[in-house]
C-alpha cells in the first residue's frame, strides 16, 4: 500500500469502501500493519543488490557459485564467437521487440504445461500500456540481448527510481545451449546498475539461478481478506485449497520436481497433438501477443 510509514487501516472497512468482497494477495510486502493479521504465508524473495556497486555484487555471485559464473561467462563468449557480436539493449522502446519477447514467453508457458497468460488480450494490453510508461518513478523496462542482429534473450519488468521488479524473462530456444537467459541477466544487472538502480527484485519462486545471483532477500506475503458474502465463500472454495496444495508442493523439492515433470509432459503431449492436427503449420496457440 502506498501511504505514510506505519499507517494502519481497518482492512475490512477498506474492502467495503472499495466495494470488494475479497482481497486475495500475493507478493505483498510483508509486515504492513493493515495486512499483517491476514498473512497466511511469508517467503523470501531473492534480490540483486547494487547499493555497494556492480563490482561488489558480481563478487558475491562469484562467491555463491564460482563454477556457475565461470560456465556462464564461457557460454557468453562462445555465443558471441559462433552467432555474432553480443549487444545488449536497455529500455528498448520498440513494440515489435516486446512482441518477440511475449511470443517466447507464450511458447515457454505452453512447452512447460503452464497457462499462457498472453492468450488473454487484456494482459497483453496492460503490458503494452506499462511498456509505454516512462516516468522517473515508474516505467516499464524492456531489455534484449542480441547476437549480431538476432535477438536471443530478453526481459520485461517494472521499475521505480531505484528498483527493477523481475517479471517476464524469456529466450529463443534455438540458442538454449548457450544459456542465453542467464547471460542476459548478468548483462541486465550491469546495465541496470549503470542506470542508477539499487536493486533487482527477482521475486519468490523456485528457479535455481536466483539462488546464485542473489545478494540479499526481501520478504513478501500472501493471504486473504474477505467480508461475509456468498461471493467470498465461492472464492474460498475455488482458491484456498489450491493455494494450500501449491504451498505444500513448493516446500518439498521432490514434489516440486514431480509436478514440474508432469506439467512438462502435458506440454509435450499438447504440442504433439497440435502438430498432428496441423502437420504443415507451426505449433501456435491463440495468443494476445499480436
Put a short name on every predicted segment:
Residues 1-44, 158-218, 224-225:
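Acyl-donor binding region in acyl/amide transferases
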Residues 3, 10, 94, 134-137, ...:
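Serine/threonine-rich low-complexity intrinsically disordered regions
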Residues 54-57, 76-81, 117-122, 132-133, ...:
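Short C-terminal domain-edge/linker segments immediately following a structured domain
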Residues 31-63, 161, 195-257, 262-267, ...:
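Active-site/acyl-donor-binding loops of N-acyltransferases
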Residues 26-49, 53-177, 271-290:
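A conserved beta-strand-loop-helix scaffold within acyl/acetyltransferase catalytic domains
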Residues 20-21, 85, 107, 136, ...:
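A general structural signal for well-ordered secondary-structure junctions
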